[in-house]
């Protein structure tokens, strides 16, 4: 794609550029210009790199959180959290992830109820998960334990276009970044597996509750973005 011209490096095959930024990143003096990653929009990394031990301990500290404070994360906190996902690797540097953030407690409860209804329908249809879903429903409906939405003050749905064959793997990469970053800004996360499975199954009552879902998109991941309980 790149070759050395009379005035420096040039792009010989513009259509083949995926805007990965590698050509710009490797320049030791920051002199390389690329129209997809222009110099004026670049942010140099000035902090010292983590040493091996610090990086190892940082990766080990990742934990799922399933008990949350009732306080709803602010828009600023959520923006910080979702912004870091832009730097996650995606197939062909496609990015293309969309997010639906839900902070309305009534709607979160309605989503959990819809998932419970879906489980009942799956049980009636003889699903392979029949026994597991029956156990979940006994906890959720008989004992009042919210093991579906975990009483989370906030839900974040990751969306990808239906024709995007790498949407699920892209979302998983993005969430991995978010999960590692969340504790640094006082947030905790966990995968909402039951809601995710229901959404991926295309259960219409759940889809109807996601008013912000763009056309021609599908749910690939659902995750809580919420405040961690301390102590």
Predicted feature residues:
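Short Fe-S-cluster ligation motifs
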Residues: 14-31, 53-61
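Small-aliphatic-rich amphipathic alpha-helix that forms the alpha element of a beta-alpha
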Residues: 62, 81, 85, 156, ...
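Iron-sulfur cluster-binding cysteine motifs and their immediate structural context
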Residues: 1-10, 22-39
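N-terminal, charged amphipathic alpha-helical interaction modules
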Residues: 87, 93-96, 107
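Glycine/small-residue-rich phosphate/adenosyl-binding loop
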Residues: 100-171
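Short, conserved, surface-exposed binding loops centered on an aromatic residue
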Residues: 91-93, 144-151, 181, 213
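C-terminal helix-cap and adjacent tail motif
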Residues: 48, 139-143, 212-231
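Extended interfacial segments that mediate partner engagement and assembly in macromolecular machines
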Residues: 45-79
């Amino acid at each position: 794609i790149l070759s050395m011209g009379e005035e420096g490096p040039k792009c010989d095959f513009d259509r083949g550029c995926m805007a990965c930024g590698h050509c710009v990143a490797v320049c030791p003096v920051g002199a390389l210009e690329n129209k997809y990653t222009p110099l004026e929009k670049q942010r140099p990394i000035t902090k010292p790199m983590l040493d091996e031990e610090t990086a190892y301990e940082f990766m080990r500290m990742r934990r799922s959180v399933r008990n949350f404070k009732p306080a709803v994360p602010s828009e600023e906190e959520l923006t910080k959290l979702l912004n870091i996902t832009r730097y996650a690797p995606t197939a062909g540097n496609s990015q293309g992830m969309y997010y639906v953030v839900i902070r309305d407690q009534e709607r979160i409860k309605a989503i959990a109820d819809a998932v419970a209804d879906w489980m009942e329908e799956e049980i009636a249809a003889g699903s392979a998960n029949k026994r597991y879903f029956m156990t979940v429903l006994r906890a959720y409906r008989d004992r009042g334990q919210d093991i579906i939405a975990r009483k989370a003050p906030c839900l974040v749905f990751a969306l990808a276009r239906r024709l995007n064959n790498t949407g699920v793997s892209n979302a998983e990469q993005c969430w991995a970044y978010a999960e590692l970053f969340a504790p640094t800004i006082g947030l905790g996360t966990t995968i909402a597996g039951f809601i995710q499975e229901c959404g991926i199954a295309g259960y219409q009552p759940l889809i109807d509750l996601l008013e912000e879902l763009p056309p021609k998109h599908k749910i690939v991941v659902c995750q809580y973005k919420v405040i961690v309980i301390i102590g």
